[in-house]
A protein has these predicted regions:
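A short, proline-enriched helix->beta-strand linker immediately N-terminal to the Walker B motif
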Residues: 132-136
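ABC ATPase NBD coupling module
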Residues: 41-57, 75, 83, 203-208
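ABC ATPase "signature
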Residues: 198-199
């Protein structure tokens, strides 16, 4: 996965997409090698892994369960900074306000709680939480699947703008081929835990070679 690009990971439910993503972040134990900027993360001990945690972030599928309802938005977004940075309280608050503006949220709402926001706004909060640490890589695990089409398009546009501005690298997990086509440079197709096809996104979906990929493309056109 090249810096500044997006890799799509598609397949039906249960194909192993999210498991693969969690393994890459070392949130699940796995075998084999996971290389980030040339470093095999599997060889690192827990303490050695800590500097990489801020460089590798995740935005989950469900914005309703991904945010702690007992924490204010400022606490949610700033939590990582308190672990991974040496900033004081004023500097953290400034960083929170800056990233909220970046994702299109009103900074005056930062002391409110997640249940006071819509689904689309909550997903922007989740994106801000990841972005505030200035990561290089973000795992996006079906981040728009629970949103309606209009809000989904807005969030996808935001992700594309942020990628271009900060040269972010995305692994985008989805079952929605339209979303993958809109965002991803290359795509991997998974079935039953195995990669069955991969390639440049446009050519892969225009000329799929594996029967399973052909099936996914047909279903997406219905």
């Amino acid at each position: 996965l090249a810096k500044g690009q997006s890799l799509g990971l598609v397949g039906e439910s249960g194909s192993g997409k999210s498991t693969t993503g969690m393994a890459i972040l070392k949130l699940l134990a796995s075998q084999g090698a996971i290389r980030f900027a040339g470093q095999d993360l599997q060889a690192l001990k827990r303490r050695e892994m800590l500097p990489y945690r801020s460089k590798m972030q995740v935005v989950f599928q469900d914005p309703y369960s991904a945010l702690n309802p007992r924490m204010s938005v400022a606490q949610v977004i700033g939590e990582g900074l308190r672990v991974h940075s040496q900033l004081n309280d004023d500097e953290i608050d400034h960083a929170i306000c800056a990233v909220m503006q970046e994702v299109g949220l009103d900074v005056d709402t930062r002391h409110r709680y997640p249940n006071e926001f819509s689904g689309g706004q909550r997903q922007r909060i989740a994106i801000a939480r990841a972005l505030v640490l200035k990561p290089e890589f973000i795992l996006l695990d079906e981040p728009t699947s629970s949103l309606d089409r209009t809000v989904q398009a807005q969030v996808l546009d935001l992700l594309k703008d942020l990628q271009q501005k900060y040269q972010l690298t995305y692994l985008f997990i989805s079952h929605d081929l339209a979303v993958i086509r809109a965002l991803c440079h290359h795509t991997i197709v998974m079935k039953a835990g195995e990669i069955v096809e991969h390639g440049e996104t446009q050519s892969l979906f225009e000329n799929p070679s594996h029967p399973y990929t052909q099936q996914l493309v047909r279903l997406s056109l219905l």
